[in-house]
């Protein structure tokens, strides 16, 4: 059975963004009952700073988290936007992952920021990093703001619809591409 991993790309306590990525993961699961889903919250794990060691050389949760990430078949990655970029915690996780760990896998993206000024951050910061890994990316993204929520719950119909469509699109993209890579491996992986 294929596995979809939702990644809550921050160490802050689960809240609105966690709720949103769970909604997208649930929609993916509902679109194909044969997939297994999991949600990884980076704040639940002690992940060392990437320093070039092999994963098994770390004494904390690093190797376990890397195994969970690289063994998944598809992803929905959510990140808050801080200072016009995705989180350092997510960047650190990506720094640990070998290219072949993500290559040829489907992925959808969710960003959340305080204002609409940071909407393009996911496209200009995170998308190029994942493209370098050879990830098959759903063309659009979901961008959320505080006004989409009320009492911590997502209430904006357009945002809810976008998350549901993103979940379904990741499953469809995974089915369409299988394990097909999107081109040659990056120079650094050779």
How should each PLM-predicted stretch be described?
Residues 1-95, 161, 168-171, 179-190:
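N-terminal beta1-alpha1-beta2 submodule of the flavodoxin-like/Rossmannoid cofactor-binding fold
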């Amino acid at each position: 059975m294929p596995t979809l991993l939702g990644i809550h790309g921050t160490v802050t306590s689960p809240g609105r963004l966690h709720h949103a990525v769970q909604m997208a993961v649930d929609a993916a699961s509902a679109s194909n009952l044969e997939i297994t889903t999991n949600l990884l919250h980076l704040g639940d794990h002690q992940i060392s700073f990437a320093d070039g060691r092999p994963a098994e050389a770390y004494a904390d949760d690093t190797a376990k988290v890397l195994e969970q990430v690289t063994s998944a078949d598809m992803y929905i990655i959510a990140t808050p936007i801080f200072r016009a970029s995705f989180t350092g915690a997510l960047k650190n996780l990506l720094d640990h992952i070998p290219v072949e760990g993500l290559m040829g896998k489907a992925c959808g993206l969710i960003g959340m920021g305080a204002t609409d000024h940071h909407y393009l951050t996911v496209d200009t910061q995170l998308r190029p990093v994942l493209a370098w890994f050879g990830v098959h990316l759903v063309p659009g993204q979901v961008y959320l703001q505080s006004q989409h929520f009320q009492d911590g719950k997502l209430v904006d119909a357009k945002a809810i619809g976008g998350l549901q469509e993103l979940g379904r699109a990741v499953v469809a993209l995974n089915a369409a591409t299988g394990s097909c890579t999107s081109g040659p491996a990056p120079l650094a992986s050779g």
